[in-house]
Amino acid sequence: MLHISGFCRYLCGNFDDEMVYVTRTEHFNAAHKLYNPRWTKEQNDAVFGRCANENWHGHNFELDVTIKGNPDPDTGFVYDVKKLSAIINEHVIEKLDHKNLNLDVDFMAGKMCSIENLVIGIWNQLVPHLPEGVKLHCLKLRETPKIYTEYFGE
């Protein structure tokens, strides 16, 4: 009996050196405020506008997590996307969803809660939990349909 991975190698060639990128999308809702305590209210309002609202504001965030690796010869997967989703949910979504980024999120403590700083913080939450052979390639974090950041760990 011919094993399917052997059959695929026979028909398609060996893909051990092929880099494939896989993206999983997750969502969370969170509130925050952009406000520099060293500045006056007027300066904060001038720089951050409505985002400096003293009563906070919120977003429906969309997070794309892109990993890269070689497809497993037996499964064809770079990594099981259900397992990737579980890692994202445990180490990111549960910490952020329906939270105040300024007050409730440990990895944002002492930082300006901009989308730029948030995407770096999310990266740092995910990297230690990915298995060997799976590399985090890119995070894309959408704050609104018109505003997003991309981070490649650089």
Language-model features, listed with the residues they occupy:
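Charge-rich, low-complexity N-terminal segments
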Residues: 2-154
